[in-house]
Each structure stands twice: as C-alpha cells, then as structure tokens.
C-alpha cells in the first residue's frame, strides 16, 4: 500500500516526534523506522513513492488529489467537524472521529474516543460526539493537556521528553506562563513561533514518566490506524468475508 500525506505549511501537531508532518519542517523525518520526505508537488510525490518513503506535501486543501487520483482518501484532520471532505473524493473515503456521517460524506468513520469502541469502523452513522474531555492516561484526563494562556505567538521553553513536575512552565504566550498541572514527561509541545489562541491545545504531559513513549505511536494511534486499514481493505474488496 502506497501512502501520500498532506498537512498545513506550518503543521500544528503536538506529538512532533511521531508525526510525519515534521517532514514539512525538516525536509525528512522518521517514525519507528518509516521515513517521510517533503514533496514539492504531486509529481515529486509519485517519484518518492518509488523510493519506498512516505511523501508529505504542504497542501491543506489536498489539491494533489486531482493529479494523484487515490484509491482511498482518509480525512485525519481531527477538526471534530467536516471541513470539506466529500464521499465523491475517491472510491473509498474515510473520516476520522466526530464530524462525519458514514453513507453521507464518507464511506466509513473510525472511532477516536478512548474506551470500548476506540478504533471501531462505523459503516452507518457517526462517531461518538466530542466531549472536549481528553481520555484517561495514567489516571489523568484534562489535567495532562497544556493549553495556551492567551492569543499570540507561542514560545517553547521545554523540549519533548523533558521531565516536569506540577507548576513547571513549559511555554509562554505574551509573557504569560503555560504551566504543567501534573508531573510526568512532556510527550508533545508546539514548536517555537506557532500562532495560538487562548485555550488552544499546545502541549501534553504523560504522567506515566516513560520517555520512550515520546518516540513511539500510542495505543490510540495504533487502534485508529488499524481501523483505517480495516476500512480500506473491506471497502476496496480486499477483505472477502465468507460464511463458516
């Protein structure tokens, strides 16, 4: 399976050490042994596919779709709403999380809420509604998320992997501190100079204190990714179900 990815010209991913979008910033990045390389356009993306790497384009509107004509399209923006994806975009269209309705604007939806149904493929209807409450990790939910204290430009003070305690300042905006409310390891944080608005998710503290988790895909990412793969294989006819 060949994969091409697109993102914003200035990605806002928090867990940058496990995000292929970093290829847009660095030119090349690697996640668990899989390499991703920045592509200038769709033609270069096709060339990079022959090198067995993941091409990443700064193409927030996915205009490359017209050239690449993918067999499957996955909207993993996680905006909690549909920003324009249509069921006619590709033979198989998959929406990730709330905001999509299988059968209306996509062929399948993959559940993103932590819990019993995480990663489940939905072929009719929608994912569970957004609660604005992060899932539990190490006994903590909303406390582990770091949010911008004001509108402005984010100033990064700590790196991913840094050990912190409650009260430590991980970043600041307009001189206002963004403090950690629990102890643990900084699992993700926005890069220096990112424009933010008050309350915007700007970092994440993992209370389990396992630095190695910063460089590997999470259980949630693996579950959702598995759901995406299942949906693509099923909807494309690669998975054929037979009666016992």
PLM segments and residue spans:
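Conserved small/polar residues in nucleotide/adenosyl-binding loops
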Residues: 241-244
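Buried, small/hydrophobic-residue-enriched core segments of structured protein domains
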Residues: 1-125, 216-237
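Accessory, usually C-terminal, subdomains that scaffold auxiliary metal cofactors
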Residues: 191, 197-204, 208-223
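Flexible, active-site-proximal loop/turn residues at the rims of small-molecule/cofactor binding pockets
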Residues: 79, 176, 208
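Generic structural motif
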Residues: 71, 107-108, 114-116, 123-171, ...
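C-terminal, active-site-flanking charged/polar segments
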Residues: 2, 188, 196
């Amino acid at each position: 399976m060949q994969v091409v990815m697109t993102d914003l010209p200035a990605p806002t991913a928090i867990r940058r050490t496990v995000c292929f979008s970093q290829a847009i910033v660095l030119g090349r990045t690697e996640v668990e042994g899989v390499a991703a390389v920045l592509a200038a356009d769709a033609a270069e993306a096709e060339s990079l596919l022959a090198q067995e790497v993941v091409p990443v384009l700064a193409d927030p509107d996915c205009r490359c779709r017209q050239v690449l004509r993918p067999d499957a399209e996955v909207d993993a923006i996680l905006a909690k709403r549909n920003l324009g994806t249509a069921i006619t975009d590709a033979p198989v269209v998959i929406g990730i999380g709330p905001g999509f309705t299988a059968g209306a604007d996509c062929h399948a939806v993959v559940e993103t809420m932590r819990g019993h149904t995480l990663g489940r493929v939905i072929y009719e209807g929608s994912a569970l509604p957004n609660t604005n409450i992060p899932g539990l990790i190490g006994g903590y939910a909303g406390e582990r998320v770091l949010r911008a204290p004001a509108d402005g430009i984010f100033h990064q003070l700590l790196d991913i992997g840094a050990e912190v305690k409650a009260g430590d300042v991980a970043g600041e905006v307009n001189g206002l501190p963004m403090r950690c409310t629990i102890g643990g390891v900084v699992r993700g944080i926005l890069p220096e100079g990112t424009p933010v608005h008050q309350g915007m998710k700007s970092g994440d503290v993992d209370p389990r204190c396992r630095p190695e988790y910063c460089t590997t895909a999470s259980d949630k990412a693996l579950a959702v990714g598995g759901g995406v793969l299942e949906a693509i294989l099923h909807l494309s006819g690669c998975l054929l179900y037979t009666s016992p």
